[in-house]
């Protein structure tokens, strides 16, 4: 949809709500997954800052930096007429010219780099760093890396903002967990583990974007999305805009919300986005249990933090959810339930009518707009050139650090290797085959802007010491074999073969789920023919979601298999360096690679994690089948010896009541505190230098059945260990990480026998016992709606 370049045109686009309400011809959003946004929602506007030195507000407390951000915002909003107030409730706000308040855009994207920024065609501000997609970043198991990436994105965002090319709020991160492998947006997430990985990613990304934990001066405002129970786009015709997800209290507490708890309570995120879908009959953006009882009252979301709708989801409360009788009622229901700002124009078009019908009051509208502007106060939006971060410029975008971090080889996962990798120095010529070999923007996944450069695998290998024979071979989804002969010819005259394929955003994307998890098109057929040539064969499996690579795993002539995700602007160079041994792989899968039949065994809309009926269980915690590659799988180029650290003594038994009676300075709740440190000695016993990564799992039969196979309680990454060198790795284990979730959604610590085991190989196992009485660590609140539906 083309953007409107004038705020005057934006205002002219607002139709009388009575005429719009009378139109009863609606899109079928039960099947259509892409909302039809109005031009105003996606408009390009002139971004600038208020003048608190000489402007109309300069003598008011709005410009008084000694007054609290909330009071300054409240003073500003008190000056608005009702029309001006309503105009401020959408993502695109025209501002208030008579007060010197410029237009503002809430909707900016920063998933793995800047998107929706106003880029120039060339020169300054024509690009920003494009990092790998989050699922690949999380596979590195490096919390520091996540924070560094977010901090660089935030710095670049502020530099663009200072130049009038970006807002100060970003609709990132996506912290939904990758529950089902067909989901098109799993690539945007930290993987399938909610309690540990998604929560850790949320904390590091949010604090990197915002400039710390609840800093006095915010760098940017992060938005934790999509709250909650959102992980389907259009599977089998089930549109995300109309899905009503049936989720038990147990699964809501255990899987669909713990990352939002960490985002709100620990990272102090300033914004949360409610999702398109309904949960248990109530659309998320009109769900006062979600938005007030759970998020604010239970999770501790900051009082002046604001909740934004997903784009047009306030409208979806009416169509297709039919939770409200009409659009004005949907708007009233959403804001009264706690959705402060509407990404879209439903609030702006229908609030006047809702006020006239006594469906809501001015105070209901003010509450959300004050929260938005309170954050802008914390961002220094009103404070002139002396405010924090206002000095950032294009020079801060063009930094060596951003180049180095964007070359993110750490997440690459070695799935299979018979010793072929790293390539022997005797290999002088290489055949490069496949649809992922000569790519450009495919490297970036989705939600991306212009990058300074895009290095494809073909580019990188052509710049290496190797002689390259390139052939396209076949497309991602093509059923043609026309390119096979050229691919085989290139392979026959080469010392080794690399095939790069898998899936891309033509098959997995926002609004697009897969119906299967097989390798698409004729790719496997071509790989099989290449494998019969008697040459070393390396396969690069690319894309965010997994495909069933069992045939490649079992084929002895496929020597090595690498998962490379969406590796960003330097992706080809990173893959080259892994293959040639300049860098060693140490990433681990943060999802399960299931066999192909998993995708058709049960509906992807079945949100139950535990096995039942045809559902064999979801995620590594509950899946009862045999995966192709397990969650946490990842090989190295070297070998490691892992043993208990002898100097660290760990008690074999802990009393539950004693643990909970401890003082807990620095922690809001005692259960957040580590009660032991799992410390191991890691020795590189091989010949190659390498990082080392580890996941620590717990398991038990304490508490009620059914029991999870295991669950993740911690992870870590050690930087490079040279041959014969050793380092200690310590993974703290918190009290809460050992708890289970009962059917009511309560987190309960049960007495019984437990094990802590390092990695899937269980290379070090620590048995321990908890004694005493079961203890409820946190109680799940009663699920009820606080706000009666609007009647019109």
UniProtKB/Swiss-Prot annotation:
Gene Ontology MF annotations: alpha-L-arabinofuranosidase activity; xylan 1,4-beta-xylosidase activity
Keyword Glycoprotein: yes
Pathway given in the UniProt record: Glycan degradation; xylan degradation
Example of a GO biological process term: xylan catabolic process
A cellular component term, taken from the record's GO annotations: extracellular region
Sugar-bearing residue positions: 23, 87, 142, 246, 326, 385, 391, 404, 438, 475, 479, 516, 677, 699
Catalytic reaction list: Hydrolysis of (1->4)-beta-D-xylans, to remove successive D-xylose residues from the non-reducing termini
Enzyme Commission number(s): 3.2.1.37
Signal peptide: 1-20
Keywords: Carbohydrate metabolism, Glycoprotein, Glycosidase, Hydrolase, Polysaccharide degradation, Secreted, Signal, Xylan degradation
Cross-referenced Pfam families: Fn3-like, Glyco_hydro_3, Glyco_hydro_3_C
Active site: 310
Compartment(s) of residence: Secreted
InterPro entries: BXL, Fn3-like, Glyco_hydro_3_C, Glyco_hydro_3_C_sf, Glyco_hydro_3_N, Glyco_hydro_3_N_sf, Glycoside_hydrolase_SF, Ig-like_fold
Annotated PANTHER family: EXO-1,4-BETA-XYLOSIDASE XLND, SUGAR HYDROLASE-RELATED
Annotated function: Xylan 1,4-beta-xylosidase involved in the hydrolysis of xylan, a major structural heterogeneous polysaccharide found in plant biomass representing the second most abundant polysaccharide in the biosphere, after cellulose.
Family: Belongs to the glycosyl hydrolase 3 family.
Stated name of the protein: Probable exo-1,4-beta-xylosidase xlnD
Source lineage: Eukaryota, Fungi, Dikarya, Ascomycota, Pezizomycotina
């Amino acid at each position: 949809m083309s953007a409107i370049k004038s705020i005057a045109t934006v205002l002219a686009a607002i139709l009388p709500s009575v005429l719009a309400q009378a139109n009863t011809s609606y899109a079928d959003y039960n099947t259509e997954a892409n909302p039809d946004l109005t031009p105003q929602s996606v408009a390009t506007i002139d971004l600038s800052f208020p003048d608190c030195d000489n402007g109309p507000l300069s003598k008011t407390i709005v410009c008084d930096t000694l007054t609290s951000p909330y009071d300054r915002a409240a003073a500003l909003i008190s000056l608005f007429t009702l029309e001006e107030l309503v105009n401020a409730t959408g993502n695109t706000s025209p501002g208030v010219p008579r007060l010197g308040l410029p237009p503002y855009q809430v909707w900016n994207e920063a998933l793995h780099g800047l998107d929706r920024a106003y880029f120039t065609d060339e020169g300054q501000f024509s690009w920003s760093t494009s990092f790998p997609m989050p699922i690949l970043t999380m596979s590195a198991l490096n919390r520091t890396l996540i924070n560094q990436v977010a901090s660089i994105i935030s710095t670049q965002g502020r530099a663009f903002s200072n130049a009038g090319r970006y807002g100060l709020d970003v609709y990132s991160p996506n912290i939904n967990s990758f529950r089902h492998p067909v989901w098109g947006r799993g690539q945007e997430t930290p993987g399938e583990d909610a309690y540990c990985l998604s929560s850790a990613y949320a904390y590091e990304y949010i604090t990197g974007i915002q400039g710390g934990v609840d800093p006095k001066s915010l760098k940017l405002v992060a938005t934790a999305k999509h709250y909650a129970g959102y992980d389907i786009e259009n599977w089998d015709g089930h549109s995300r805009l109309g899905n009503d997800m049936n989720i038990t209290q147990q699964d809501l507490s255990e899987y669909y919300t713990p990352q939002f708890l960490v985002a709100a309570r620990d990272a102090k995120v300033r914004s949360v986005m409610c999702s398109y879908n309904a949960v248990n009959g109530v659309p998320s953006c009109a769900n006062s249990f979600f938005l007030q009882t759970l998020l604010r009252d239970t999770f501790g979301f900051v009082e002046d933090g604001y909740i934004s709708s997903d784009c047009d989801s306030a409208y979806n409360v009416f169509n297709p959810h039919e939770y409200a009788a009409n659009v004005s009622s949907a708007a009233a229901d959403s804001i009264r339930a706690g959705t402060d700002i509407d990404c879209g124009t439903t609030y702006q078009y229908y609030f006047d009518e809702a006020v006239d019908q006594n469906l809501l009051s001015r105070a209901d509208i003010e509450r959300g707009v004050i929260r938005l502007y309170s954050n802008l106060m914390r961002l220094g939006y009103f404070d002139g050139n002396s405010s924090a971060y206002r000095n950032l410029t294009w020079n801060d975008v063009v930094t060596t650090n951003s180049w180095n971090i964007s070359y993110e080889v750490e997440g690459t996962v070695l799935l299979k290797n018979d010793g072929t990798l790293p390539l022997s120095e005797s290999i002088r010529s290489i055949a490069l085959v496949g649809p992922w070999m000569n790519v450009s923007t495919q490297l970036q996944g989705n939600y991306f802007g212009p990058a300074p450069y895009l290095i494809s695998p073909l580019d990188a290998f052509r710049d290496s010491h190797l002689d390259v024979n390139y052939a396209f071979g076949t497309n991602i989804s093509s059923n043609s074999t026309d390119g096979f002969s050229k691919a085989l010819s290139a392979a026959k005259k080469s010392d080794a073969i690399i095939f790069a394929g898998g899936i891309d955003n033509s098959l997995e994307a926002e609004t697009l789920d897969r119906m299967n998890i097989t390798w698409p098109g004729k790719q496997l057929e071509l790989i099989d023919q290449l494998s019969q040539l008697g040459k070393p064969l390396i396969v690069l499996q690319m894309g965010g979601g997994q495909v069933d690579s069992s045939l490649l795993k079992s084929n002895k002539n496929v020597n090595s298999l690498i998962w490379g995700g969406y590796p960003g602007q330097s992706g080809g160079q990173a893959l080259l360096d892994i293959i040639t041994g300049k860098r060693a792989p140490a990433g681990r899968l943060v999802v399960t690679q299931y066999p192909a039949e998993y995708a058709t065994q049960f509906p992807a809309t079945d949100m139950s994690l535990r096995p039942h009926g045809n559902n064999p269980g979801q995620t590594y915690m509950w899946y009862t089948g045999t995966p192709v590659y397990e969650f946490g799988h990842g090989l190295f180029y070297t070998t490691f010896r892992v043993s208990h650290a002898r100097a660290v003594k760990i008690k074999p038994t802990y009393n539950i009541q004693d643990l909970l009676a401890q003082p807990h300075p620095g922690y809001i709740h005692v259960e957040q505190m580590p009660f032991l440190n799992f410390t191991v000695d890691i020795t590189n016993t091989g010949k190659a230098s390498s990082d080392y990564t580890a996941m620590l799992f717990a398991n038990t039969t304490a508490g009620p059945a059914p029991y999870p196979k295991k669950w993740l309680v911690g992870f870590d990454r050690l930087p490079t260990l040279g041959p014969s060198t050793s380092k200690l790795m310590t993974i703290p284990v918190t009290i809460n990480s050992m708890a289970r979730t009962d059917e009511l959604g309560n987190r309960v610590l049960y007495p019984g026998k437990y094990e802590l085991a390092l990695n899937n190989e269980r290379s070090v196992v620590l048995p321990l016992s908890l004694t005493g009485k079961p203890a409820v660590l946190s109680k799940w609140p009663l699920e009820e709606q606080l706000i009666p539906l609007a009647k019109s």
